[in-house]
Amino acid sequence: MNISIIQNNNPLSMMSSVYRQNQSQDTNLPSALTIYNSLTGAKVVASAYQFHNLEALKQFIGMSFNVATENLFLLTPFGIKLKFSMIVHEEISEIYVFDRRYFNVNNIEASGNMDNVNDLLAELNQTDFINMIKPLASPLLSEELSVFVEKLTLVLENTTQIKAVDINLNMLRMLLNSLKRNSGWASALLSDFKKTVAFDECTPEDNDLETILTSLNVLIQYVGLVFKTLEKKFNDSIDALVLLQSNSLVDQWRDQYALLKRIPFEFKSGSSNVPEKLFLSQLVNESHLDKCAEESRRLNKSMNERLVMLRSKIEADVIKPRQELLQEYNGYMSQYIRPETDATQKTQKIQDCKRILAELEVHVSKLIQSSSSLPSFEELITTASQTSTTLSASSIANIKKLTQLYKYQESELVPYIFQLANNLYDIQINKLNARKELQTKLICSTLINITKIQLNIMRLSTVLNTEVAKNIASIKENELQLSVVSDLPLMFGIFVIANLNNLKFGISLNNIVKKANEIFEMLRFMESRNRAKWLKEFLASSGADKVEFLHLDEEARERFINENMLSYKLEQVDAIRSKKSPSPVDHPASPVSGQEKHYLTSINRLLHNINGFPAPRPTATELPKQRETNIMTNLARNISVKSIVSYINTLRKEGIDLNIVNRLEECLKDFGITYGAIERKAIETEDGEEIVVKGKNAGDLGTFDVNDVNYMRLFKKFIKSFESEGIVININVNQQDSVSNDELIKGYERRIRKLENVLHTRNFQQFNEQWSRHRPVHTLPNPVSRRQSDMSQEPAVHENTILFNENVVLGRKTIDLPPSHYGERIERLEKENERYRGEIEELKKGTDLAELDRLKKEIEDLQKADMEKDKRLAALEEENKNLKESNEELTNSNKELVNMCEELKSMKSDLLENMTQKESEFGKEAKVNQQEINELKLRIEELEEDESNLVNVNKTLNERLAIKDGLLCQLYELVQGAYGKLNQMSGEIFSNLTRVCLLLESIGLLLIRETPSFDNHPGTLTIKRVKGLRSRKRQIKQASDSTHNGNLQNDTFEDSEHIDNALMEVVSSEVVPEAEQYLHWVDTNVLNYTISSDLGIEDEIEHKKNESSLIDMSLCEESSIEKKVKKLLANYESFNVEQGFQNFLRFNHVDNELVIERVFRRFSDVETLARKLQKDKTQQKQELKMLTAELDGKIAFRNFKVGDLVLFLKTLTPANEELGGGDEQPWAAFNVGCPNYYLKNTKGEGYIELSDRDWLVGRVSKIEPRQVTEQNFHSKTENPFRLAKSVVWYYVEAREVKE
């Protein structure tokens, strides 16, 4: 038996054992990935760290399994498609590889074409690198040799003196060579079966079957996951349809529409002041809603039918085939994965294989031992003398020995060895055939069924994603159109409230503009008055009449006062803005974020949370455009609180949901709009009349003060907009009730307007006195002192300004007015004096008597107190004497303290003089220091500018350096990759040289050097025909094994065990070991200093990028990358890589023309031999055909089988005894040692007429064995011939042969 390894249909070599190309089987690799081929069972183990992306993994798998990258389909356990993130996170350790070509849709149509299946199986065999070849016949089994030996035997027996011409020397040489080749043939068979026959219970073929079925299970799980996706889509479609149908408004929208007809919205037109009424039913299109309802009914009916049809389609095309697929998989498991009950049978088979192999080894040893003493051809043709042609006695004896050896091997050893080899071959081929059978079933049936299921799932998914999804979307759109009828009261209410809020915003903005105008005007007025007063005082106190440039006329005075006093006044531009503002654009409603501060935030959030539906289309756009535009425009411009309140009351009256009514009321309150009872408040004027004060509440739009939230939001934004760098404005709101304050402010404003004329006539004299009361009078004014005086007077100035008055709070204004003139002030004071006098007189009249009684009681109390005081006086006099004495002592001490105080005062005066002197010195020193500080600041600015320039230069240099470092890193990586590829390429070149030598040696040629090599210069190569390569290889292998193992085995075991390595692995040519010396010219020490192994260059580059703003003083130093470059160049020169490369090329180079010429010449000889063998083969086929025809005409008499020609004769047993009274006697086959073969001649087709006949010649068509047991011993049908118990007999059906 021989096994040929075939790649791309070209025989690479002849091997005597199964060869399988496995990359790596080490499962202990870090993050090992086990990759399985789903159709061949092959396995590859690789480390996950060597793959940087999914494309690299696919390229590795494609090269390992000979599958194109675009045809790869990768699955993980449990049927999940492979993602590269699973490998990165080490979530998987197994990958199953499928070829997309076996899942092609075209395979479904060509499923009955066996040619296509055979092509796919042939590709699998090529991919698996296994091709079993049946054991070849022995070289001795040749008819030509048999005839020659018979003739030679006759010559040897009948002739005493044999001449050379009496013997065919060519045939004698052929006989000798055949005996030599026969031992090699037997050794090769034994070596083959020792390596191919497995003695373990788990063989590689069983592992392949298990891997194939496991891959099929993974594929079935993948189909299940795809089906679950389809099932989820189908269930989601049903749920969506059921939800739409349960909440459908097809039958309820009419009632809602009738309710809209009873809900009006009343408002007055601005131009004609005529009340208008708008019913909500005018905002929707009834005909369009009717069409939507009808369309929704039709789609619901069609969708119900469509989903029912899809369900039946899924059950028929997906669910049922999946169940059949699972049954088919279970059948494969029970058929090819042997259960544990077969363990005994499996053990028995292993024992049989061992027994057959042991017998084969014994007979091969006998054959090799018998062939060990074969004579040479010269010993067979030696003559008696040099001049004689008669063979010598020794030659005749050798020829007789040769013929005897031939007969012994040809008759006894070779047939038995060949039979044992065929038995082992059958056992081994059955294992491979089981896998091939499973592959055929998978390709012909299972994979095609899986492809059909996937195709059906894709088609059904397309229907669900397109037709069903589109219809459900249409139903949803129609339902949204119908939902507008129920949502319209809320939507319209929110819209009109928003228009009302816009109106309020305009009023609020107008109030803020007016207030800002007043403030700006007041500031201008106060500044002009201050300038006039200052100019007057300056001219009066500085002696302006003595200086010519201060002689100012009226025009110069006015220019000084009014220069740079520009008027900043805000004006309303409502008309211009309304003309230039673009028309509003309708945008679809979108969800509003909760963090958005906008007055429509609550509205949008409310609309989006009503029912969870997207914004419906504005149905109102389908109404007549002119009428709708006029109505909506008038409504937006003339909206009022009263109209909205009336609308809300109408909704409540018509029974609209209270949630809608409450939401509208909440929206109204959120806008700061009140619509409750209006509080009337009256105040009395100076003239005695009573008026009603509403404050700033314009038409119930709000109070526009601190209690109005909406107004305060806008007012705070306005005030906060004045913030700038270093200035923060904090707004504190007074929580007092502002209604009464507003009424009071209204009264003050009326009084202010009455007093304006009086104030203007007196030219604001009181104001000037008040503003200038804190200003120094007799100082020389200059711009610096003027600014200082302004700053010192700032609190006083701010006392009477509106912006800085402490009494002014937000929403309330109080102004303290000075008296208009002295007369009015005197008159007011006299009135207050008279009022106080009257009060004093009234108090005197009512309190005289009470005062008298009180005084009497006090006198009595005083008398009692005097008596007690007299007693105490005596005690005090004594005490006084003592105190006088102590007083004198204190007086003396006091004088001393006075003296000490005078001394301290003098010291204080001296200290004050010293402090004054030091202060003057400190002032001078401070000026000097200030000058130095100014100079240093200028210097600092210059240095900062220089620093910024240096930072920019440093940044640019760092960027360039980082780019260069990156380029050097890339060059390092390229060098590293180039070294690795050069090393790999060197190995491939050396392997090619080894393959060339092995190829030449396999055809009997040897590559040698004619001249010896010296001083790294190879000698001349030549190819010679050499005999004895087998023995030479055997010697080399034995020598290497003895070197490694230290012991030698017997020759027989050595020849049988290592013959494969001697033929395929051992190279006899001395050119290969000579070239191997120069194989490692790429010294790996050059790569010891790579980018990733030294000095942290990436960190250095990153550090430079992060600190690019600083001045890097290490730019002038030599970087670590530069050091590594120099070290790499030094290593390159020291290791002499160039010389090694040249030596490697010289000693690995083989001339192509030399090889081609010698191989072509050798193959010409082989082709000549092949033609001769083919001619012999044709002749043997013809002889075999003649012998077969001759054998078919001979009658068999033992070991009957179907197709044999048999002679049937009547038995001597009476018919009635055998057949129970039948008319016919039984017929039996003529035999020698094979009894009980009876003819079965049943009536019908093939019946033979046996009457009046003594014999019958027929060809056996069927043999049916029977056995007589105790149960059927008396049965006429089971034992018609009354044979003894336990006798085995046979029913033979035959066809009569007449010619």
From Swiss-Prot:
**Its quaternary structure?**
Homodimer.
Alphabetical keyword list: Autophagy, Coiled coil, Membrane, Protein transport, Transport, Vacuole
Tell me the classification of the organism that encodes this protein.
Answer: Eukaryota, Fungi, Dikarya, Ascomycota, Saccharomycotina
Q: What protein name applies here?
A: Autophagy-related protein 11
Q: Where in the cell is it found?
A: Preautophagosomal structure membrane; Vacuole membrane
Q: What functional role does this protein have? A: Involved in cytoplasm to vacuole transport (Cvt), pexophagy, mitophagy and nucleophagy. Recruits mitochondria for their selective degradation via autophagy (mitophagy) during starvation. Works as scaffold proteins that recruit ATG proteins to the pre-autophagosome (PAS), the site of vesicle/autophagosome formation. Required for the Cvt vesicles completion.
Q: Provide any one GO MF term from the record.
A: molecular adaptor activity
Give the range the annotation lists for the signal sequence: none
The record ties this protein, via InterPro entries, to: ATG11, Atg11_C
Work out whether the entry's keyword set contains Protein transport.
Answer: yes
Which GO annotations describe the biological process of this protein? autophagosome assembly; autophagy of mitochondrion; piecemeal microautophagy of the nucleus; protein transport; reticulophagy; ribophagy
Name the gene: ATG11
Task: Name the coiled-coil region(s).
Answer: 294-367, 820-962, 1164-1194
Q: How does it sit in the membrane?
A: Peripheral membrane protein
UniProt keyword annotation of NADP present: no
Q: What's this protein's family per the entry?
A: Belongs to the ATG11 family.
Task: Tell me which GO cellular component terms the UniProt record holds.
Answer: Atg1/ULK1 kinase complex; phagophore assembly site membrane; vacuolar membrane
